[in-house]
Design a protein with these regions (language model features):
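Alpha-helix C-terminal capping segments
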Residues: 33-35, 54-65, 80-92, 223, ...
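Active-site diphosphate/adenylate-binding microenvironment
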Residues: 4-8, 12-17, 22-25, 30-37, ...
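Active-site nucleophile and cofactor-binding loops and adjacent substrate-binding regions
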Residues: 22-24, 43-53, 68-75, 130-131, ...
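Structural signature of the thiamine diphosphate
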Residues: 17-18, 60-97, 120-172, 190-200, ...
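Glycine-rich, anion-gripping cofactor-binding loops and their flanking helix/strand elements
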Residues: 60, 206-297, 374-404, 416-420, ...
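Thiamine diphosphate
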Residues: 96, 104-111, 366-479
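Phosphate/pyrophosphate-binding active-site segments
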Residues: 133, 270-364, 479
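N-terminal cofactor/phosphate-binding cores enriched in small/glycine residues
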Residues: 2-81
């Protein structure tokens, strides 16, 4: 057994079932090893950003890692933007990055690079194997670390000679660490502060936004009439009919400040206090109300459901939560589609258990608002703010749950970053509906130009925000997918 075979067998033994890949010459031993694994599905992406984004979508929807297979430092670099999003989303994910054979590095061949340096900013853990057998050991470590609550990005660098080297052995599995929990004393203290607050709120993120965790947030709301608020860009939000409803923090800083105004106490579970996405002249960066008591009770690596349940119990909250969402069917005027009636139609038709990948940009407010009362669904959004996520995440979500309908809400400009994902959707016959927002512009940047104080921008400035020449939405119709205009 060579090192590549030992690694792939170790990954399969650890429950890894999918490899999203864009391999090169240095990964051919790994490609051959995947071929011998009946339990591992291999999915090709034509661009590394599709590969890493798909692994992110898969990990968000399964809470376990897929593996990516990437070609040296440049291949990894091509996938970094969506690894940034995955890291911000705290997704369990394993990257396998091929490297030159150890003895070949001294020649400084054209594709030689500092892979550790490239990987480190977008990874929580990086390791280069030391031998063929150590390649499997590194894989076992990555399986365990990637699933440390709520999830981590692990990168294993595989030198070519370690992949082809013989006499390698399969590594034993390593037990995944159990989630950390809050002390009884901290729970009791937080309960008393919430009970004594005049205008309280729960501010939630990460796994606090799953249905079972939100149930306990709703219990607390029923006890003290607290607002339940989530991050602007949550990694995975379960919502719709039968789920405790939640308010989403607005994107723009001044709107967020107004949204939080009047709160006297905010308890944070699974999220830090919010800040503005960017600095602006004469606009706030810190968004929480001045004078409000801010309690950071549980960071994202603390068991969120356990925290909320014990907090509700300590407050003697009722078992029946408040703010359970009911389903609503919207009446709309027929005619030319706009963001509001398109959102109403989507909300009316969204099937139960659907998965929404949201990169709708400036159209997103309408879709998020109207689908709040749709059938139960999962909502995945661009958590790290790096555009080009929407289509690849939809791929990963559809691979994770082939029996569930996936809807990709995709702004036209950001979709062009990873347009190759459509090819993978067609190749894998994935059940995905892609709804394109034909803005013909970088709509958000037209807004931001004014917000940073630029008045009367000239022709050259505006041309950098215009997507109408040529109309890029046409590009979406040429990748073997059936389309409706």
């Amino acid at each position: 057994m060579n090192g590549a075979e030992a690694l792939m067998q170790t990954l399969c033994d650890g429950g890894v079932e999918v490899c999203f890949a864009n391999p090169g010459t240095s990964e051919m031993q790994l490609v051959a090893a995947i071929d011998k694994q009946k339990k591992m599905r291999a999915i090709l992406g034509l661009f590394e950003g599709v590969v890493t984004g798909a692994a992110d979508g898969y990990g968000r929807m399964t809470d376990k890692p897929a593996v990516t297979l990437l070609h040296l430092g440049p291949g990894l670099a091509n996938g970094l933007a969506n690894l940034h999003n995955a890291k911000r989303a705290r997704t369990p994910l394993i990257n396998i990055v091929g490297d030159h054979a150890v003895d070949h590095l001294k020649y400084n061949a054209p594709l030689t690079s500092d892979i550790i340096g490239v990987a480190s900013p977008m990874s929580d853990w990086v390791r280069t194997s030391k031998s063929p057998s150590d390649l499997a050991t590194a894989g076992a470590e990555a399986i365990a670390i990637s699933q440390s609550y709520p999830g981590s990005i692990c990168t294993v660098i595989a030198p070519g000679d370690h992949a082809w080297g013989s006499n390698a052995v399969i590594a034993p599995q390593i037990k995944v660490s159990t989630p950390k929990t809050i002390s009884d004393e901290d729970i009791s203290d937080a309960a008393q502060k919430l009970l004594g607050a005049e205008y309280p709120a729960l501010f939630l993120g990460s796994r606090a936004l799953r249905k079972d965790a939100l149930h306990h947030a709703g219990r607390i709301a029923a006890k003290i009439n607290a607002r339940i608020i989530c991050e602007t860009l949550p990694a995975r939000l379960q919502r719709g009919e039968g789920v405790v409803s939640i308010e989403r923090l607005p994107y723009f800083a001044e709107s967020a400040v107004e949204f939080l105004k009047g709160l006297t106490h905010i308890t944070f579970i699974g999220a830090p206090p919010p800040v503005a996405f960017f600095a602006y002249p004469d606009k706030p960066g810190w968004l929480s109300p001045e004078g409000a008591e801010l309690l950071e009770l549980a960071s994202p690596n603390i068991d969120a459901e356990d925290t909320l349940k014990r907090l509700a119990d300590a407050m003697d909250a009722p078992n029946t939560p408040e703010k359970i969402q009911t389903k609503e069917i919207f009446d709309y005027e027929e005619g030319e589609l706009n963001r509001d009636n398109a959102a109403m139609i989507t909300a009316n038709l969204l099937p139960e258990n659907a998965i929404v990948s949201d990169e709708s940009g400036t159209s997103g407010g309408s879709f998020f608002r109207y689908t709040a009362s749709a059938s139960f669904h999962d909502w995945l959004i661009i958590t790290g703010g790096s555009i080009g996520q929407g289509l690849p995440v939809a791929v990963g979500a559809a691979v994770a749950h082939p029996s569930r309908k996936v809807v990709s809400l995709q702004a036209d400009g950001s979709g062009m970053y990873t347009l190759q994902a459509l090819w993978t959707m067609a190749r894998e016959n994935l059940d995905i509906v892609v709804i394109i927002m034909k803005n013909n512009s970088y709509g958000i940047l037209n807004i931001e130009l004014d917000r940073v104080g630029v008045k009367n921008p000239g022709e050259k400035a505006l041309s950098l925000l215009d997507l109408s020449n040529p109309i890029i939405a046409v590009s979406y119709t040429h990748l073997t997918l059936p389309t409706i205009e």
